[in-house]
Amino acid sequence: MSVGRLWSGLLLLLLFFCSRSSSCGLSTHVEIGHRALQFLQLQDGRINYKELLLEHQDAYQAGTVFPDAFYPSICKQGKFHEVSESTHWTPFLNASIHYIRENYPLPWEKDTEKLVAFLFGVTSHMVADVSWHSLGIEQGFLRTMGAIDFYDSYSEAHSAGDFGGDVLSQFEFNFNYLSRRWYVPIQDLLRIYDNLYGRKVITKNVIVDCTYLQFLEMHGEMLAVSKLYSTYSTKSPFLVEQFQDYFLGGLDDMAFWSTNIYRLTSFMLENGTSDCNLPENPLFISCDGRKNHTLSSSKVQKNDFHRNLTMFISKDIRKNLNYTERGVFYSTGSWAPESVTFMYQTLERNLRMMFTGNSQTALKHVSSPSASYTLSVPYARLGWVMASADLNQDGHGDLVVGAPGYSHPGRFQIGRVYIIYGNDLGLPPIDLDLDKEAHGVLEGFQPSGRFGSALAVLDFNKDGLPDLAVGAPSVGSGQLTYNGSVYVYYGSQQGRLSSSPNITISCKDTYCNLGWALLAADADGDGQHDLVISSPFAPGGGKQRGIVAAFYSHPRRNDKESLTLDEADWKVNGEEDFSWFGYSLHGVTVANRSLLLIGSPTWKNISRMARSSHQKNQEKKSLGRVYGYFPPNRQREITISGDKAMGKLGTSLSSGYVRVNGTLTQVLLVGAPTHDDVSKMAFLTMTLHHGGATRMYELAPEKTQPALFSTFSGDRRFSRFGSVLHLTDLDDDGLDEIIMAAPLRITDVTSGLLGEEDGRVYIYNGMHTTLGDVTGKCKSWMTPCPEEKAQYVLISPEASSRFGSSLVSVRSKERNQVVVAAGRSSWGARLSGALHVYSFSSD
C-alpha cells in the first residue's frame, strides 16, 4: 500500500471526523497533559507518579483524549454517546479508583502502572473540559469566546473552538513529544464500566475501534491540520489571542487544574475516597475537608452539538494492533507522519520561494540583536510585560521584566520578576540566562497567581526612592475566584527593593483579576505618579465590563499595609458586558493636565433597538473604544470609537512628539490590531483579515477631541500590526521614533499555508511623518507597505516566537536601546520566552 493512498484516506477521515462534529480537541488535550506533567511533584505517598507517567507516555497520552472516543457518529453511529458522557464525570473516576484499589494492591506491575497512567490522562481531560466548556462555572473559555466573537452564541463558539484549538495547537506548538504508539487498557475499562453501570454497556471491539480512530486522527492532525489556520483565525480573534493565556480555561489554566486533580487522584489511589468530597463535577473534588461553595458544582451535559455522520473508513488504513492480556497497543508502523514530512517540507520551501523571493536582506533590516536574554524554564512567558526605570539611582536606565508563567516543581505559574541594571553602555551586551545572571529576582508565592503579569515603577510612599508594583491577577485560582492581587515593593537607599511586599492590594470580587495591568501616572493632580490598576475581566457591575482604579501616592503609606479595591481613591467601570475596559492604559500630560487614556477593545456598538429587542446580530462586534479622563475628575472627556467590526481599537496606546509635515506635534497612537484592510498587488486586491492598523491622532490642548492625522496598516493577514506601540527618541534629535509591532506576522502571503510566524517590529523616524494613509503611498507593486516606510525593521531571529509581543526602550549615557520580547521563544526552553536587545545611537 502506498504512503500517498494511506495518507489520503487518513486526511479524509480527519476532515469528516472533525469538521462535522464537535468531539475534537485531541491535540489540545495532549498538549495540556504534556504541560501539566512538566512541573508535577507529588511528594507524599509511596509512588513517584511523575516517573510513572513519564515511563508510560503511551498510556498517559491515550488517556488524555479517551473520554471523547464514543461521541462522534463515525464511532458506531454514535450509539455509545452516553458512555463518553459518563467518562467525563466524577463517578467514573470514583469507580476507577475503587477498581484499582480492590484488584491491584501495591506494588503495581507494569500493566497496572499503565492503567494508572491512563487514568491520570483521563482526569486531565475531565477538569480541562469543565473550564473549557464552562460546565458548572461561568465565564469559561468557550462561553467568553461566544460572548465576544459569536454574538453570545455558545454553540457557534463550541463548534469553532474545539477543532480550532487543535488547528492552533498544531500551528503554534511542536509535538515532537507525541508517542508513536498508544496503549489502551481494554479489559480494565470493560470491568470499570461494568461496575459503574451495574451491567454491560460496551464491548471490547467498540473500545478498540473507536480509540484507534482517535489514534489515527491525532497523527492525521500532526500532518496537515495546521494548514487550516487561516480559516479558524478568521472566525475568532479571541481563540488566537487567548488560547494559552485566558485566566479560566486557557491552556495554562487547564494544565494547572490538571496538576490539582493529579494530586487528588494520587491521594485517593493510596488512601481511598472516604476522606474526600466527590461531587459530580470533578473540578470541585476535595480531600481536605473543605468544599468550594463559590460556584455551582452541578453536572452539566458536556457535549450536545454532534451532527449525524456516517462514512466508510478505507480498509487501506491497516490496523497496527498488538494485544496484551489486559490491553492493546496502537502503533504508527511504517505510515508515521515522519515518512511524508520531507515531501511536505520540500513543497513548502519551493512554494515559499515563489511568494517571498530570495532577495538579499534589505539594508534597513536588523536581523541580529546585540544580546538576547533567556530562561531555562519552559512556559515562563518571559517578557510578558517590561518596564524601564533607574531603580538603583545611578543615572542609567534599568530593565524590569515579568515572567508570569514561571514555575517550580510543585509550584505552577507562581511567576517571577527580573531586574537587569544598565550602565554607561546600556544593558549587558552579552547573552544571559536570567535565572543565573539577573541582578535581582522577585518571586510570587501564590499557586498559579501569575506574579509578574504587570509592572509599574513609582514613588508610592513619597520617600524619594523608586518603588515597584507587581500584578498577580490569578491569585485565588485554586479556589476558582481569580481575585488577583497587586504587590508594592519599596526601594531603599542601597538601590535594592524589599525582598517581600510592603503593600498588598486585593479584590473581593470573583473573577476580578486585579493587577492585569498597571500604570504609573498622575491621578490627583500633584505632578507625582500614582498607582493606576486595571482589569478588563473584572465584573464592573456586570460580566467582564472591566475596572480602572487609582491609589494616590503619599508618605502615609505604612509598611505591611493591606488595601482593597474598595479603598481606591479613584475608580471607573466599563459600560458593557465583555467590553474589557482597562485592557490598555496610558498616561500623558496635555497642556499641564494629566490625561488618563483607557482602552476597551471589545466594546460593541449596541443600538437601543438591538438592546431592547435582544437582536444580537445588530451589534458590531469588538469595534473598540478609547476613553480619556482628567483625574481626579471621573467624567469622561474624550471618546474615540472604532468603525470596523472585529477591529478592536484601543488594544494598544502610546504618545509622544513627532514632526507632521514639518510641524512639531504631540500625537496619540491607538492600535486596532485585528482591523481588516485591503491589499493591492498590481491589479489584484485581497482582504487582509486581522492585518492590523494604527491610528495617529493630534493631542491639541485647544481641541476637545483628538483629530485623526494618519493611519498605518500591516501587510499580512492575521499579523496583528499595531498590537504593541511605543514612542521614544532613539537618535537624540528631540523627536520620538514611532515603533509598531506585528508579532503574528507570517513571511509569506498565504497566512500559514506555507510558513510560520516571524513577527516584525517597525521603527519610523519621527522627523518624517506625513498625513493620511502613510503605508498606502507605496513605490512598490504591493500595498500596504509598512516596511518601505520604516527606517528600521527588526526581524525575528526565531520562527513562531511571537517576536514583538511587548517592547520597551532603555536609555543610557552612550546609547538608546530597544528591548523586544518574543513571548513564545523556545531558545532557552520550550515556549519560555526571550528578550532581544537592539542598540541605537545618534550617529
Curated annotation (Swiss-Prot):
GO cellular component, one term: intracellular membrane-bounded organelle
Glycosylated residue positions: N94, N271, N292, N308, N322, N483, N502, N592, N605, N661
Reactions this protein catalyses: a 6-(alpha-D-glucosaminyl)-1-(1,2-diacyl-sn-glycero-3-phospho)-1D-myo-inositol + H2O = 6-(alpha-D-glucosaminyl)-1D-myo-inositol + a 1,2-diacyl-sn-glycero-3-phosphate + H(+)
Tree of life domain: Eukaryota
Entry's Gene Ontology BP terms: cell migration involved in sprouting angiogenesis; cellular response to cholesterol; cellular response to insulin stimulus; cellular response to pH; cellular response to triglyceride; cellular response to xenobiotic stimulus; chondrocyte differentiation; complement receptor mediated signaling pathway
Reported modifications of this chain: Glycosylated.
Signal peptide residues on this chain, from the entry's feature table: 1-23
A GO molecular function held by the record: phospholipase D activity
Broad class of where this protein is predominantly found: secreted
InterPro entries given in the database record: FG-GAP, Gprt_PLipase_D, Int_alpha_beta-p, Integrin_alpha_N, PLPC/GPLD1
Ranges: FG-GAP repeats: 368-429, 435-498, 500-560, 564-625, 635-695, 707-773, 791-843
Enzyme Commission number(s): 3.1.4.50
Record keywords, A-Z: Glycoprotein, HDL, Hydrolase, Lipid metabolism, Repeat, Secreted, Signal
Subcellular compartments: Secreted
SMART domains in the cross-refs: Int_alpha
Family under the similarity heading: Belongs to the GPLD1 family.
Quaternary structure (record): Monomer.
Entries under PANTHER family matching the protein: GLYCOSYLPHOSPHATIDYLINOSITOL PHOSPHOLIPASE D, PHOSPHATIDYLINOSITOL-GLYCAN-SPECIFIC PHOSPHOLIPASE D
The protein's role, per its UniProt record: This protein hydrolyzes the inositol phosphate linkage in proteins anchored by phosphatidylinositol glycans (GPI-anchor) thus releasing these proteins from the membrane.
The protein's name: Phosphatidylinositol-glycan-specific phospholipase D
Organism of origin: Rattus norvegicus (Rat)
Lineage: Eukaryota, Metazoa, Chordata, Craniata, Vertebrata
